[in-house]
Amino acid sequence: MAKIAVIVGSVREGRVTEKLATWVAKEVANQADVETLDLRDYPLPFFDETIPPRYNPSRTLAPEVKKWLDKIAEFDGYVIVTPEYNRSVSGVLKNALDNLGNEIADKPVALVAHGSTGGAQAVASLRITLPGNGAVTLPNALFFTDQVGEAIDDAGILKAELQEGPYSAQASLVGLVGALTAYSDALATVRT
């Protein structure tokens, strides 16, 4: 069974992203082993290296960076749940990704975003960034306006009306996670 990380891409107090990530993790748990990685638990120094980490395997790592890299390398695939800040992702998420070397190379990443425009620009930004880390982004993503905070309770339960029907948010998530696990299985042959 695939081991999937759900990454909470915001550290703000009262963040909607955490609720969304809880909902996502519940569905991932139905199809794979799951662990939620909260960037609050991985405070990283600001990335300022001259050589990109993918091309500098002998770089000296700060202990916080080593902890992050060791953890992220454990997984077969990822779901990044991100808010949209200023038409992109949060600075803390971008910094966490910039610190990666080959830990996510040849591994799939599903994207779930929220924001005033549904998080579309955050997803577009990640589709540019992640291939630089060697990751494979899934062609589909989930987009939510900021009202998603009212649609999901603190326990990660989606309102009933959003769970019903073939085009519901719940059905879309089930499909996205199914695709993620299929990509994970397929890409495992590339990584061996």
Question: What is each PLM-predicted segment?
Answer:
Residues 2-31:
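N-terminal beta1-alpha1 ligand-phosphate binding loop
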Residues 3, 33-35, 108:
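Residues at the starts of beta-strands that form the adenosine-phosphate
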Residues 29-35, 136-137:
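A generic structural motif
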Residues 40-58, 152-153:
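N-terminal beta-loop-helix "entrance" segment that forms/cooperates
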Residues 56-136:
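Helix-loop-strand module that forms the ligand-binding subsite of alpha/beta enzymes
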Residues 138-192:
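Glycine-rich phosphate/pyrophosphate-binding loop and the adjoining helix
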